[in-house]
Amino acid sequence: MGNGLSDQTSILSSLPSFQSFHIVILGLDCAGKTTVLYRLQFNEFVNTVPTKGFNTEKIKVTLGNSKTVTFHFWDVGGQEKLRPLWKSYTRCTDGIVFVVDSVDVERMEEAKTELHKITRISENQGVPVLIVANKQDLRNSLSLSEIEKLLAMGELSSSTPWHLQPTCAIIGDGLKEGLEKLHDMIIKRRKMLRQQKKKR
């Protein structure tokens, strides 16, 4: 699921085998942001407590094409009082990972509001967004099409590339696939920005 980014290109093959990307992990409190971060770092479940400020980790990931990239993740607390700080972390970011709890139907409207708010900030125009639909292993989780509708993904700016990825952060299902999609979107954006600079 996404807006026109499903085509497979050979962009990755022309890149150096080592790259670093600044990624911000956002989402409501209790969505599973920190669980996502430490599952990626340690490849195991780490019991976490609510994030009061932020966690930051540099994590090397080998993508499907055997290229190793470093993601510098900033996992920012999702409590309401911390959300005004989100824009400070997204300044100059390469990509945003927005984690939603696939079971928490009652807070999906709140998640939608925050997602649209952060993507509409001028500095974030065009920044790729990976929406992580977490807790997909639970029986009462919403389907991807339901989440896409509730988050009003079709109403995001046409300049904002996005991908909705089903995951289970506790066991790691879907996380690497999501990162590969995010990486693809970032590379496409960088290439587009370079082409725009050449035309000036």
From Swiss-Prot:
Alphabetical list of PROSITE patterns matching this protein: ARF (PS51417)
SUPFAM superfamilies referenced in this protein's UniProt entry, alphabetically: P-loop containing nucleoside triphosphate hydrolases (SSF52540)
One GO cellular component term noted in the UniProt record for this chain: cytoplasm
PTM comment: Myristoylated.
GO MF, one example: GTPase activity
Compartments in which it is found: Cell membrane; Cytoplasm; Nucleus, Nucleolus
KW Membrane (keyword) present: yes
Residues annotated for GTP binding in this entry: 27-34, 75-79, 134-137
Residues lipid-modified (N-myristoyl glycine): G2
Tissues where this protein is expressed: Expressed strongly in testis and liver. Expressed slightly in heart, spleen, lung and kidney.
Pfam family, one: Arf
SMART domains the record matches: ARF, RAB, RAS, SAR
Main location: membrane
Gene3D superfamilies per record: P-loop containing nucleotide triphosphate hydrolases
Keyword annotations of the record: Cell membrane, Cytoplasm, GTP-binding, Lipoprotein, Membrane, Myristate, Nucleotide-binding, Nucleus
Gene Ontology process terms (BP): brown fat cell differentiation; intracellular protein transport; vesicle-mediated transport
CDD domains documented for this protein: Arl4_Arl7
Complex and partners: Interacts with CYTH2. Interacts with KPNA2; the interaction is direct. Does not interact with ARL4A.
Membership in a protein family: Belongs to the small GTPase superfamily. Arf family.
Summary of the function given for this chain in its UniProt record: Small GTP-binding protein which cycles between an inactive GDP-bound and an active GTP-bound form, and the rate of cycling is regulated by guanine nucleotide exchange factors (GEF) and GTPase-activating proteins (GAP). GTP-binding protein that does not act as an allosteric activator of the cholera toxin catalytic subunit. Recruits CYTH1, CYTH2, CYTH3 and CYTH4 to the plasma membrane in GDP-bound form.
Protein name: ADP-ribosylation factor-like protein 4A
Organism, as annotated: Rattus norvegicus (Rat)
